[in-house]
Amino acid sequence: TSAIAHTALGYREQEGAYTHDPERARELLDELGWVPGPDGIRTRDGERLEFTINEAVPQPRSREIITKIQEQLRRIGVVIHLNPGDNATQNADSKDYHKIQIRHTMVGRADYDVIKSMWHSTNRNELLNGSDDTVHDQHLDDMLHQIASLAEEADRAAQAREVQDYLTEQAYILPLFEEPVVYGVQPHVHGFQP
């Protein structure tokens, strides 16, 4: 639906931006010169169209989600590899573009700063924004910095919405789902509100 959960401050629905359309995907890949080889995998200039994605170990069902992505992308001629390893390995490998090209991740916070902490080049830098210690998208960093700098809540909300639009327009992210949260409380607990 968007870069942040629908319950997060500043959320904006990215309606129509993420449509499942395998036929259009095939057309776009054809236009870019990625043609199916004998095994159905697309190639261009002798290079196979394949990527490696991390397993988000702390997230339930990450492996199953990636398996489903592998299945769906294989149908259009794209190979997805799952990066093996524990959480420390996944985090280290995710900072190396040669090991992981697509990052499966999420952060469970609902404040305005979560969007900055996720994608700013000096925070988590989930986009690998500048793999050689440079900032690949200075405009994005500037937009994210504004979220943390603005004093008025309405201004911060507007900036968070602009960042979501930008992340979508640049195709930097692909929201898959909003992870459900389950709370268990004992009968003697009163007044609990998630």
Regions inferred by a protein language model and the residue ranges of each:
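Surface-exposed patches in mature extracellular/periplasmic domains of secreted proteins
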Residues: 1-2, 37-42, 81-84, 159
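Early extracytoplasmic/lumenal segment of secretory-pathway proteins
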Residues: 79-92
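Short, well-ordered beta-strand elements
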Residues: 48-57, 80-83
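Detector for C-terminal structural segments
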Residues: 1-25, 61-70, 90-194
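Immediate post-signal peptide segment of exported/extracytoplasmic ligand-binding proteins
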Residues: 22-52
